[in-house]
Amino acid sequence: YLTIVPLFHCNGWTHTWMVPAVAGVVICCRDVTARNVYHAISVDGATHFGGAPIVLNTIIAAKEDDRLPFDHTVQVFTAGAPPPAATLAKIEPLGFNVTQVYGLTEVYGPATECAWQDDLWGETEQAERAAIKARTGVAMPVLEEATVLDENMDPVPWDGESTGEIMMRGNGVMKGYYNLPEATASAASAGDTLRSTSASGSRRL
């Protein structure tokens, strides 16, 4: 696992202990450049990393001298913003499979993801492929539930258009903000569900 996300992020510092726990290897990258990323993949054998879309664009824009060959598909978690269709169209042929994830510190980092179904979407055109990969609503195992509720706390329709507040519940959801009871109260609903007040979403099947 190539560490690109800073270690003070949940995604960064959890991987530093989780990867060795399953007999994996952590490769540290102090200076995130295309040359260093390609070196970690080609020479050190990195198979996974996480990074914002800007990191993907750095790889795409690499000078020819900075590119090194590799013979495996690199799995990439990206977050912060959906990867643009143009970015996906350029980086996937280079040997990178991009998965969009969503999360925040209050839920211990990434909590939902786009669960790609190749049997359904494997032959889709690039524009539709990018739109599907921008979805990120499938709860990861640490999350009991992820849903989208309207202002009345009712689930929004599964139409992909109606928007509401993202709500999450599970073992990884924070108990509260330290010494900030008012902030905790505003972020919690029914005591055990986190209101993602900074983000809205929609639902579709």
Where are these regions (language model features)?
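A structural signal for the hydrophobic beta-strands that form the central parallel beta-sheet
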Residues: 3, 28, 51, 78, ...
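Alpha-helix capping/helix-boundary segments
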Residues: 33, 55-56, 83, 173
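Conserved AMP-binding/adenylation subdomain of ANL enzymes
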Residues: 8-47, 62, 145
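A short hydrophobic/small-residue beta-strand
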Residues: 1, 26-27, 48, 98
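Conserved ATP-binding/catalytic segment of the ANL
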Residues: 136-138, 158-159, 165-205
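Residue-level signal for inorganic ion chemistry
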Residues: 41, 49-52, 197, 205
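Gly/Ser/Thr-rich phosphate-binding loop
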Residues: 21, 43-51, 60-131, 144-145, ...
